[in-house]
Amino acid sequence: RDRQVGAEEISAGIRRFIIGLSKKMLIANVMAVAVDKMFALDMAQLDTASAWVGAVCYLFQIYFDFSGYSDMAVGMGKMFGFTFPENFDYPYTASSVRQFWKKWHISLTSWFREYLYFPLGGNRKGKARTLFNRFFVFLCTGIWHGANWTFVVWGIYHGLLTMLETALVKEKKPRSNENAAEALIDNQPAKKNVFLSIAGHVYTLLAVTIG
């Protein structure tokens, strides 16, 4: 199919590229300075407050770094007539770890879903098999990130969290792409909705920061 590239597409691509470059240069790189200083400290020098500051800075560094590169790729594609899929969907607004992984590094999670999770049976072969499939996918995701025991532990950590959420949250029959946490919240009174939403966001941010 012939690609159509006009002034509007080029302008949109340039804007998106500049946004991505700004994320990388003005936020991610600045955060990286603080993160490097914190990570360079000995355990004896690192107090609780400094550890949390370093963890939060790293949380923002990795997001603005990676999403910045993704924005630049999307913008560059627009300039040449390509439409690349979005790779991030405001992941830090998620109210569960499962929802977080629907919003973070979407290209990677989509690949694992299509070529590993679904072929393993997805959620079609009972609760126990679903739990195993989710855990195994995250274990493989950890190994994909690097052949190091830290990445294996990372994969196990997120695999266990998604297993726990799947096991504990009572799911309704899905309406479109609704996830389990959203289904649970939809069934609660208004005041509980607010509480559960805030609690879900806090839990997810803590879980992602730690892991």
In which residue ranges do the predicted regions lie?
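Membrane-embedded transmembrane alpha-helical bundles that form the catalytic cores
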Residues: R1-G211
